[in-house]
Amino acid sequence: MKKESILKRFLYFLLAFLILCIEQAPTIFVRVKDVRAVSLLILVMLLISAGALFLGKRMGLLEGFKTLSSLKAWGMIGLTYLGIYIVTRIGAMVMMWEGVSNSTNQEIIENAHMNPFLLITFTVIMAPIVEELVFRGLLMGRVFNPDSIVGLILSSLLFGLVHMPNSIGVWIIYAGMGFTLGTVYRKFQKLEYC
């Protein structure tokens, strides 16, 4: 591998890390109750989401909504979520055998007592957009070759790690979700399917 290629891959890795840090920055303020502060925080989260989408589009990692216009696309999305459901059920069974009732990640979210609108913005909009850009788009698509098994495994393990697993069952859930999403990205190279 050439020095230029190694440097470029390292810079993509740093970009992925920076984006994750930017995504996490607003979580410092999730306990705010003032309506104006909540509104501002939601706006910041939406801007981070829009920035991630813009960056993904500019880097050629996203094609846009036209990708979702086919029946095949929706079939793949359905199969992806079926895979996530299966992995989650397996992980939940292992958690039950371990005597673990909740993941650390879930406990943090529940104990934060977030405003419901903040919670929805963070967990339904910002986190999925940013995490797909980082773990599938940048790590699998740019740091590694999208077809790389090493990239698939490493991005899956890192995806599991950032969700703070506290048991084998939780590892199965989050790393399994990362592996499912990564497998779909590896096969079709479309973040929109993830």
Residue ranges and their predicted role:
Residues 61-127:
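Juxtamembrane helix-loop-helix connectors linking adjacent transmembrane helices
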Residues 116-194:
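Transmembrane helix-loop-helix hairpins at the membrane interface
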Residues 1-18, 58-89, 144, 150:
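Interfacial transmembrane-helix boundary/kink motif in multi-pass membrane proteins
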Residues 5-13, 37-42, 69-77, 115-120, ...:
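Residue-level signature of transmembrane alpha-helical entry/exit and packing/kink sites
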Residues 31-36, 95-103, 142-149:
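Membrane interface segments of multi-pass transport proteins and intramembrane proteases
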Residues 6-59:
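Alpha-helical transmembrane segments in multi-pass membrane proteins
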Residues 45-53, 103, 177-186:
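Alpha-helical transmembrane segments and their membrane-interface exit regions
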Residues 17-26, 81-89, 156-164:
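Aromatic-anchored segments of alpha-helical transmembrane domains
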